[in-house]
């Protein structure tokens, strides 16, 4: 059993052959989320994977109401084992936005952002953690199209992207959907720069 200790919490990863192991992108999103989240907030993490980011928030903030979604059944079990309430579903599909409890102050997403051709797909469930489609933005664009319906007035999203994903393209998409987009964190890692973009409803 692999474990990672970070931000006052020890995360159990279980079978890392099927679950994305938290790395620099996970750490950067967790750090950004800790700065953005406040006590009393309703928070949703989409595609929570092992539950790393959610578990860090739960360990460091009091009185938050946190829900997560995850499509990979192995990762969903891992997130539950780390104390995260998780619904196994694709993005927002298992959540009904018309219910008041399903409107959130803050939504987090670390999407698969690697441009991926059919030949580059990873076998099995782990592909969901890496495969961003040909543009690297396919899953992110689906998320952005739906996110607004799940936010409270003035709500915010935090998304982790790579310089490979195309920062300006992402900001333009967010702007077209009624978000004010700002970069709140960035970190150079080997061949890419990791970037956390905040979108605030206008």
Report the location of each language-model feature:
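Auxiliary N-terminal substrate/complex-recognition segments of SAM-dependent methyltransferases
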Residues: 1-202
């Amino acid at each position: 059993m692999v474990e990672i200790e970070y931000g006052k919490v020890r995360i159990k990863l279980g079978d890392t052959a099927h679950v994305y192991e938290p790395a620099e992108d996970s750490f950067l999103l967790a750090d950004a989320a800790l700065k953005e989240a406040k006590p009393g907030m309703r928070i949703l993490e989409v595609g929570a994977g092992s539950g790393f980011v959610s578990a860090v928030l739960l360990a460091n903030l009091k009185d938050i109401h946190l829900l997560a979604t995850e499509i990979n059944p192995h990762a969903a079990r891992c997130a539950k084992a780390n104390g995260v309430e998780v619904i196994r579903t694709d993005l927002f599909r298992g959540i009904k936005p018309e219910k008041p409890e399903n409107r959130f102050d803050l939504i987090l997403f670390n999407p698969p952002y690697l441009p991926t051709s059919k030949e580059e797909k990873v076998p099995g469930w782990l592909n969901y953690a890496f495969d961003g489609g040909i543009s690297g933005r396919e899953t992110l664009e689906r998320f952005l199209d739906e996110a607004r319906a799940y936010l409270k007035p003035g709500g915010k999203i935090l998304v982790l992207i790579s310089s490979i994903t195309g920062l300006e393209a992402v900001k333009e998409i967010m702007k077209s959907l009624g978000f004010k987009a700002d970069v709140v964190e960035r970190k150079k890692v080997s061949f890419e720069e990791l970037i956390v973009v905040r979108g605030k409803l206008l």
